Amino acid sequence: MAWKTVRADEFCSFVTDGTHDSPKPQSQGRKLITSKHLKGDYIDFDSANWISEGDYQKIIARSAVEQWDILFSMIGTIGTIYLEKSPIVEYACKNMGVFKFAGNAENAFWMYYYLKSPQAKEYIQSHLRGSTQAYVPLGSLREMPVSIPDRETRNRIVSLLKPLDEKIATNRAINDNLMQQA
């Protein structure tokens, strides 16, 4: 089957970004995630700031993260991605792209792997802006071309990649455990 190319905002249900506000850190409440907390296959919640429930509600009213959304670091460190697999999401995000899929796991997994592709990385690199701190404009994320095969081919490719990612995550967890024991 032939592949087609569509814009990210046509493939996703919505492409948005997290808050640009800087809520005052609190001693408890909800976590506020930024690009530096994205570690690929997990989020480093330990180093994230707490924010008030009021600030959290204000942020998620605009850009709530849901299961199968992809977080994309778009300021500073560019291109780190995280696929939210949990049905319960209790954090807000700041200064990062959010590719939303309205619960469509198939499309989310395809986009997750596509964002790791040389084509996507080249597109992102060619759309960087900023002299002091690099960033990718939200409009560029929305307009990003996404190559898509037919559904059967897409699912076959994802079914080959998912077990490899799971093995990598398992090995990382083992390594982390060994480092803690040393």
Description of each model-found segment:
Residues 1-18, 143-182:
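Non-catalytic DNA-recognition/assembly elements of restriction-modification systems
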Residues 5-24, 36-67:
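Sequence-specific dsDNA recognition surfaces
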Residues 29, 47, 93-95:
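A generic structural signal for short beta-strands and their flanking turns/coil linkers
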Residues 34-35, 53-116:
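A short beta-sheet element
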Residues 74, 89-97, 109, 129-158:
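A short glycine-rich beta-alpha junction/loop motif
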Residues 117-121, 145-147:
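Well-ordered mid-protein domain cores that form the structural environment of catalytic cofactors
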